[in-house]
């Protein structure tokens, strides 16, 4: 029974649970790697050895956190669990493909970890730029293993994206318009479209790199008429939509949390929120070269990418102000998910402001590859995506096993985590402005103060992670069952009770229009 249920599962709730557990495990691996980085940088001088091993750790940290923590939890975990419940579908459109989507992840993670363990590891950074990622600078199997790992996780995400798009468009009740689906469903839909359009380009780029390394092609080798800049264009055409893939489901979750704990039936400006997400998704594809301001592009090209990047701030601002408007006049309940959501809104805004600064190509020439960039994207990832995941987890946890997390412990956990991530990443802005470059294992003594503070912050974040494991254990040990859930008519995922039955909506849901009700 256990093998058929968990290995051959075709149930969206079970596969979502597998994704959540896998993501939690990968998150701990990624956290361990990040602590190695911060231990190395806690004071001047070498700890682990040379820059190669340092960069192997940094590269693995990025890949693990992006592809095996954030995406499986947000899209695989919350997406699988909530989308069918929110649209009244009995399951996903392709349940077996859903299972395959998950089971491609563990072998992919194994390949990635193997790539770090053989030869000298992948010391290229997560971008794997040639010629550093080529077979001269990185001889041996490491980079090839990492490329295969990316192929698998890419196939997994593409299959998942096809599944979500089909499910959301085709499996709503017949009378329901797309504009009646909850915002989280919209966010997963936009995310899935981004995945479907961007991942094939990454696959093309890394496949060309694979043949350059092993079959003597010269796609990225000027000696044979190739161009390493081509790889950068292909990579960032995927890489920029990818960062929006990481944050969009978080937008959807935060919209639900803010509305719920403000006692509102719906978020402020539903249509504006939907169109903002679609605008972010579209604009995300036409700004990729802002990662390449230092490779020698024409001034008019730089002007375009600067302007286009700044325009993304407009729909993002629409979302931030709509969340604030949702709070306005609400009967606010200061429960833990609301704290995570408010932290998310504030820190996403800070990360967005540093993003506007980096969008200026003239400024970016100076700030590119400094810790300012690291601070910027960790504000939107380590404090945007992660705070959204934590808020979603605390909010929807009662739905998954049917038990409630401890209200006081989760608030303390929020406080510790919030202090930890801010102490880790705010000093990095000053390091970047002072010119400290990224991807070096050592630094001049002048940078010691901010680095030591940053490393102390990372230790505080570690205590928060351990505390959260205790909170999860406590919930399963105490077995506090859910009593009642408020506002179920606008939060239909709760309608079937906590936890919901194994099969929900076994016959098509009947949706009555608001007009008919009056």
Swiss-Prot record:
InterPro entries given for it? Cyt_c_oxase-like_su1_dom, Cyt_c_oxase-like_su1_sf, Cyt_C_Oxase_1, Cyt_c_Oxase_su1_BS, Cyt_c_oxase_su1_dom
Which pathway is this protein engaged in? Answer: Energy metabolism; oxidative phosphorylation
Any idea which positions bind heme a3? Answer: 376
SUPFAM superfamilies per record:
Cytochrome c oxidase subunit I-like
**The organism's place on the tree of life at top rank:** Eukaryota
Q: What is its main location?
A: mitochondrion
Cofactor comment:
Binds 2 heme A groups non-covalently per subunit. Binds a copper B center.
Q: Where in the cell is it found?
A: Mitochondrion inner membrane
**Which residues hold Mg(2+)?**
368-369
Segments passing through the bilayer: 12-40, 51-86, 95-117, 141-170, 183-212, 228-261, 270-286, 299-327, 336-357, 371-400, 407-433, 447-478
Q: What is this protein called?
A: Cytochrome c oxidase subunit 1
């Amino acid at each position: 029974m256990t093998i058929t249920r968990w290995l051959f599962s075709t149930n969206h709730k079970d596969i979502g649970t597998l994704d959540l557990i896998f993501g939690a495990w990968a998150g701990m691996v990624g956290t361990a790697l990040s602590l190695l980085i911060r231990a190395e940088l806690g004071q001047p001088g070498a700890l682990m050895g040379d820059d190669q091993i340092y960069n192997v750790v940094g590269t693995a940290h990025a890949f693990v956190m992006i592809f095996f923590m954030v995406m499986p939890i947000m899209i695989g975990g919350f997406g699988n669990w909530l989308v069918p419940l929110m649209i009244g579908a009995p399951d996903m459109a392709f349940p077996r493909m859903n299972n395959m989507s998950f089971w491609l992840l563990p072998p992919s993670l194994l390949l990635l970890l193997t790539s770090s363990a053989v030869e000298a590891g992948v010391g290229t950074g997560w971008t794997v730029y040639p010629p550093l990622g080529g077979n001269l600078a990185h001889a041996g199997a490491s980079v090839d293993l990492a490329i295969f790992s990316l192929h698998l996780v890419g196939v997994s995400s593409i299959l998942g994206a096809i599944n979500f798009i089909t499910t959301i468009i085709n499996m709503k009740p017949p009378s329901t318009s797309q504009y009646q689906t909850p915002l989280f469903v919209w966010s997963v839909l936009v995310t899935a479209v981004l995945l479907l359009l961007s991942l094939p380009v990454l696959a093309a780029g890394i496949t060309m790199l694979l043949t350059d390394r092993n079959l003597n092609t010269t796609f990225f080798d000027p000696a044979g008429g190739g161009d390493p800049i081509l790889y950068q264009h292909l990579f960032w055409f995927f890489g920029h939509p990818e960062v929006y893939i990481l944050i969009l489901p978080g937008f959807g979750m935060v919209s639900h949390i803010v509305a719920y704990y403000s006692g509102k039936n719906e978020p402020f400006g539903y249509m504006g929120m939907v169109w903002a997400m679609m605008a972010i998704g579209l604009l995300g594809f036409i700004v990729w070269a802002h990662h390449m301001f230092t490779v020698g592009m024409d001034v008019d090209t730089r002007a375009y990418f600067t302007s286009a990047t700044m325009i993304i701030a407009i729909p993002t601002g629409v979302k931030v102000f709509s969340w604030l408007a949702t709070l306005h006049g609400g009967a606010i309940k200061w429960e833990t998910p609301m704290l995570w959501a408010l932290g998310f809104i504030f820190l996403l805004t800070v990360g967005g402001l540093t993003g506007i600064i980096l969008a200026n190509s003239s400024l970016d020439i100076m700030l590119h590859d400094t810790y300012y960039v690291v601070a910027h994207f960790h504000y939107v990832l380590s404090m945007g995506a992660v705070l959204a995941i934590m808020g979603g987890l605390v909010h929807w946890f009662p739905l998954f096993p049917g038990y409630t997390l401890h209200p006081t412990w989760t608030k303390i956990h929020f406080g510790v985590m919030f202090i930890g991530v801010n102490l880790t990443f705010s000093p990095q802005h000053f390091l970047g402005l002072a010119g400290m470059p990224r991807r070096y294992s050592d630094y001049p003594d002048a940078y010691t103060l901010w680095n030591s503070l940053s490393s102390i912050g990372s230790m505080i974040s570690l205590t928060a992670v351990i505390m959260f494991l205790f909170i999860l254990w406590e919930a399963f040990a105490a077995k506090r069952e859910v009593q009642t859930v408020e506002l179920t008519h606008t939060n239909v995922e709760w309608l079937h009770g906590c936890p919901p039955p194994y099969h929900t909506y076994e016959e098509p849901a009947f949706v009555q229009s608001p007009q008919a009700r009056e």
